Amino acid sequence: MIQTITHIMIISSLIIFGIALIICLFRLIKGPTTADRVVTFDTTSAVVMSIVGVLSVLMGTVSFLDSIMLIAIISFVSSVSISRFIGGGHVFNGNNKRNL
C-alpha cells in the first residue's frame, strides 16, 4: 500500500517537473532580455537537478548524485560568467587585476 502511494507520488512529481521544464524552456527561448534568459537557465538547471534526483529515488540508486553535483557546478559557473559578461562586457581580465 505504501509502496503504491510512493510510486504514484514519484510519477506525479516527474510529470510536474516535466511541465515546469517545458515552461522554463519556452521562457529560455522567448525571453525578452539576456538577464531573463540567465535566470531561466538557472531555474532550468534546478528543475533538471530535481528530475535527476527523483529518478534516483525511483531507481533506488545513489549513482546519479554525482551528475546532480556536476549540473550544479556547471550551472553556477555559467551563471557567474554570463552575469559578468552582461555587467562589464568581459568575463576575465587580461591583466589579472580585479575590478573594484
Curated annotation (Swiss-Prot):
Pfam families, alphabetized: MrpF_PhaF (PF04066)
The Swiss-Prot or TrEMBL record annotates one GO molecular function as: sodium:proton antiporter activity
Q: Which UniProt keywords apply?
A: Antiport, Cell membrane, Ion transport, Membrane, Transmembrane, Transmembrane helix, Transport
Q: Which GO terms describe its cellular component?
A: plasma membrane
Q: How does it sit in the membrane?
A: Multi-pass membrane protein
What is the top-level taxon of the source organism? Bacteria
Q: What is its main location?
A: membrane
Give the transmembrane region(s): 5-25, 38-60, 70-92
Subcellular locations according to the entry: Cell membrane
Q: What does this protein do?
A: Expression of the mnh2 operon in E.coli is not able to catalyze Na(+)Li(+)/H(+) antiport. It does however confer higher growth rates than the control strain at up to pH 9.5. The operon may encode an NADH-ubiquinone oxidoreductase.
Q: How does it assemble?
A: May form a heterooligomeric complex that consists of seven subunits: mnhA2, mnhB2, mnhC2, mnhD2, mnhE2, mnhF2 and mnhG2.
Q: Which protein family is it in?
A: Belongs to the CPA3 antiporters (TC 2.A.63) subunit F family.
What name has this protein been given in UniProt?
Putative antiporter subunit mnhF2
Give the originating organism.
Staphylococcus aureus
Q: Which gene encodes it?
A: mnhF2
